[in-house]
């Protein structure tokens, strides 16, 4: 390490495993931005379920060890490399990706994954935009090609991606239904775009949804837990309806005939497959939503960096999401 190089606190993962492999260190060198890169002083970082899958080693993409998790940071520009002319020191920004990892006091990001954060949103809200809103937008607009007047059911609607999907769907003129497992979660879902909400902890909640939508069924289902819900989803769809799989924590057996009768589709989505150009399209639409006011992230549990392992435990095994989980720095 170069003499006099600035140090920072950062969470490091040296082996794949449970939350206990998240190690907070205080002697990590602050990255230096190269061409087309920006260094951000992190004020808040979003915690996403996918980060727990990556940490456990069960996700399709595995980072080289050791690494620092986290892609969704919000803070201020500390420094820029060459040709990063869109930003200057002190600019308020948020990211959709990082190079060095977001669970840290400073994060390095490619300049095309950094966006100006409007004054009307605070840093916690800025850290809640990245994966949730870009994923929800990709699922609804890019993959499902939703149209105004169609119906959408958002499973797990009280979490980060779910609330983002509700807000986007409502803004685009859809009939929005959501599910949540707590009274508080249901209330938040209704406050953020849903026309109706159902308690997925009730044994007969699928019957209630069927009664609500009638014979036509649901045009699009945004599915956060496909290994639990996929069979039920297929029974809820309209003719030509689509299940957009955003999340799954295991396997499930389905009867392909259930897709044949209604000529329905099951489509998987990951925001990591987005091209640079697609990210720019999504960002433009989402930044318009910030200005208009329909994009307003809801913040849930908040943790200091020292409690990152607890955050990872709770995002998977907690009793029910009520907004976006955030690390505060």
UniProtKB/Swiss-Prot annotation:
Q: Which reaction does it catalyse?
A: 2 a quinone + NADPH + H(+) = 2 a 1,4-benzosemiquinone + NADP(+)
Q: Which positions carry N6-acetyllysine?
A: 23
Q: Which residues carry this modification: Phosphoserine?
A: 248
Q: Where does NADP(+) bind?
A: 53, 158-161, 181, 200, 229, 246-249, 269-271
Superkingdom is: Eukaryota
The record's InterPro entries line, in alphabetical order, gives: ADH-like_C, ADH-like_N, GroES-like_sf, NAD(P)-bd_dom_sf, PKS_ER, Quin_OxRdtase/zeta-crystal_CS, Zinc-ADH_QOR/CCCR
Q: What class of enzyme is it?
A: oxidoreductase
**Could you state a single Gene Ontology molecular function term?**
zinc ion binding
Q: Does the keyword ATP-binding apply?
A: no
Q: In this chain, where does the modification N6-succinyllysine occur?
A: 296
- Entry's CDD domains? zeta_crystallin
* The entry's keywords: Acetylation, Cytoplasm, NADP, Oxidoreductase, Phosphoprotein, RNA-binding
**SUPFAM superfamilies annotated for this entry?**
GroES-like, NAD(P)-binding Rossmann-fold domains
Oligomeric and partner information: Homotetramer.
The role this protein plays is: Does not have alcohol dehydrogenase activity. Binds NADP and acts through a one-electron transfer process. Orthoquinones, such as 1,2-naphthoquinone or 9,10-phenanthrenequinone, are the best substrates (in vitro). May act in the detoxification of xenobiotics. Interacts with (AU)-rich elements (ARE) in the 3'-UTR of target mRNA species and enhances their stability. NADPH binding interferes with mRNA binding.
Family, per the entry?
A: Belongs to the zinc-containing alcohol dehydrogenase family. Quinone oxidoreductase subfamily.
Write down what this protein is called. Answer: Quinone oxidoreductase
Organism whose genome encodes this protein: Pongo abelii (Sumatran orangutan)
Name of the encoding gene: CRYZ
